[in-house]
């Protein structure tokens, strides 16, 4: 027993001696200091911007992912897509939610908040649009025995999730058309099932075509897309649009089309002061976004990019000073290049004719030259 006790005490003593060495071995050679950690945290957050898309099923999430795929290089600029709840909430998130730099909303959101008054009269001064994006078409899925949108008067109609772009646009368009439907708020999948069973009369989907919820329908027997008339009351906020067999092979017969309306999707940000760190990050984003525009026009990017025009204006909205500055610089560069080419052209023309041109002749000729350049660049 004495031998056992001695051995036990020896093992305990060895463990006591070895323990500090084991702890020392576990320590890294170059431990991360608090200062190093803070430096890393600052560096990793320095060039990050976030963009709030709409719901996971909308076209704008694919658009935001395209932006990240093209612009995010992991260090100089990181773009983080975020899944939101739609145009109504996205405006609130851009205004109030920490960490949200930009969001996609719809151009008619101004009319919506003008009606509700929820954000006050001057909220538009706090929001700036970076770019007018693509059109989001209004789809109305009905049973095949419905032939006119006014037949939906007093009928149960699915307007999508509350606060969604579908709900907002659906309400405003129906109001303009003088139609009062019984609003339902269902998912697209549930709405299609209830439409087939006759529990509802129609389901509205507002998103860039092709809408996944509709293009994924396998059995469309008894269903069709309903036309939306483009009346005068819709001209201020909406565009005429069409849905074709190529968009929805099982819902639109070949050779036919369904006329509808579309609302514009808009990329917006908070209207930061130019001394804010957020302003500096947005400036870097805008420069890369606009400069790399051609990359968005090519496969495998979403076909809706072909509708985007960064220089387009939106009535009632304030354009981001960052976006306006980039556009102004681009116009100046184009003008300078055109002027240089034109001066060479005039010099050659003067040498040919042997007679110097007057200022008025140069002005007339320059206007003609710009028109000629524009017509040839569009070919």
Identify the residue ranges that each predicted region occupies.
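An extracytoplasmic/periplasmic, membrane-proximal ligand-sensing/linker region
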Residues: 27, 33, 190, 196, ...
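Extracytoplasmic
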Residues: 46-48, 58, 74-76, 86-89, ...
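Hydrophobic h-region of N-terminal signal peptides that target proteins for export
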Residues: 10-19
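Pocket-flanking alpha-helical
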Residues: 68-69, 80-121, 192-194, 210-217
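Immediate post-signal peptide segment of exported/extracytoplasmic ligand-binding proteins
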Residues: 19-51, 145-156
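Pocket-lining segment of extracytoplasmic ligand-binding domains
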Residues: 107-108, 117-118, 179-277
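Bilobed "Venus flytrap"/periplasmic-binding protein-like clamshell domains
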Residues: 46-71, 79, 136-193, 197
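Ligand-binding clefts/hinges and TM-proximal coupling segments of bilobed small-molecule sensing domains
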Residues: 162-173, 241-315
